[in-house]
Amino acid sequence: MDILGALESGEKYRLEIPGLPSPIDLPYVEIPEGGKRLRIVSLNLVGLTGLNRDLGKLLAARIRSAIPDLSGVVFLTAVEKALMLCQAVAAELGIEAVAVAYNRVKPHMQADRRPTLQVGSSSVTSGSKFLALYERDINLLLSATRGVVVVDDVVSTGGTLLALNDLLEELAERHGRDPLQMRGIFCVAREGDPQALLPAPVFSLASLPQPVLL
């Protein structure tokens, strides 16, 4: 039985991931792209607690295999689609806190009195946007002595990952230290072929079809 059942209508793509008890039927969606429409398979994990838990266990095992010693390593993710997944991975690995890049500077960050960082980014599902770190995440990243692990839901063009790397480089420059090494990018799925040279190896559980421009 499909994990998501019949929660979403329309044509579906069946994603099978080794280790999951059942396949996931994901909807095809069309999003604006340069005056046309881009047809993609939508993997939206927001709100799916059980699926995030199960995928988190699988990704945690992949991380343990690739990086057996996680001491001095800080986990980083971007809101909002990958946040629950990253929290599930961290819980499985016994990681107490993860650094989060937000999609804009928010009021609680108190940017007029606390340190913040912001860079631009672009992704298939979110389009052009900003990514921002505030004091708590900055200090957590500065505590890393052996690099950073990025957790994401889907790696497509790589725009979000390049923006995360820009944040790490800006953070290092501002604090007069060498840039933090991105040790690996761990995701549920890769979508098509990356359009950019990514800053770290990508470890995925599955693959999604190439987006189609209509």
Predicted stretch roles:
Residues 69-80:
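Short glycine-rich phosphate-binding loop at a beta-alpha junction
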Residues 1-71:
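Active-site-facing substrate-recognition patch
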Residues 1-14, 163-214:
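PRPP-dependent phosphoribosyltransferase catalytic core
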Residues 96-148:
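Short, glycine/charge-rich flexible loops or terminal/linker lids adjacent to PRPP-binding catalytic cores
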Residues 84-93, 164-165:
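Short Gly/Thr/Asp-enriched flexible loops that form oxyanion-binding sites at enzyme active sites
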Residues 152-164:
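Acidic, divalent-metal-coordinating active-site segment for phosphoryl/phosphodiester hydrolysis
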Residues 73-74, 147-149, 184:
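Structural motif
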Residues 82-86, 193-194:
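Short, well-ordered alpha-helical microsegments
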